Amino acid sequence: LVKRKGIKCLVLDPFNKIRDIDAKSDDVNRYTMDYLAKIEAFCKKYDVLTFIVAHPTKMYKTNDGKIEEPTMYNIKGGGEWYDASYHGLLVHRDYDAKTTKVKVLKVKFQNLGENGAESHFTWEPRSGSFVPHVTDEAAAEPMPWE
């Protein structure tokens, strides 16, 4: 696709359904690290930005009945995801509030973002897209240029 179509961005979704048939290890941690290294080498060689969608293992509900917020360590092969990734984003739904949070879990290069920064979105069925979720508090705050 890089040579035929000239793609510059690739989304692998979901990661666990795309197998590495040349894998040399049955150990999930070693497999994950080797696979991520192959993806990184591909990205550098062809100058392609790759988003890897990796779902967490089973998440449990907290005492208040909400599903706990996962981290990169909740993905199968946990520590390798954090160690091998330059950046990590969390997309987490709050089904009660009907919002979706996007949170920065890891930023290797600090000029590209801030660890822990988050934004909230609401699904807009008419447009078929997510729109920024604005609370009354946020609406009252002036923008930096105001």
Q: What kind of feature is each model-predicted range?
A:
Residues R19-D26:
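Conserved ATPase-coupling elements of RecA-like P-loop NTPase cores
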Residues L1-L10, K24, A37-D47, K58-E146:
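C-terminal regions of RecA-like/P-loop NTPase motor modules
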Residues K17, H55-K58:
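Signature of the SF2 helicase/ATPase Hel1-core->accessory helical subdomain module
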Residues D26-M33:
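Non-membrane alpha-helical structural segments and their capping/turn regions in soluble enzymes
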Residues F51:
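P-loop NTPase catalytic core of nucleic-acid-dependent motor ATPases
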Residues P14:
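Walker B catalytic acidic pair
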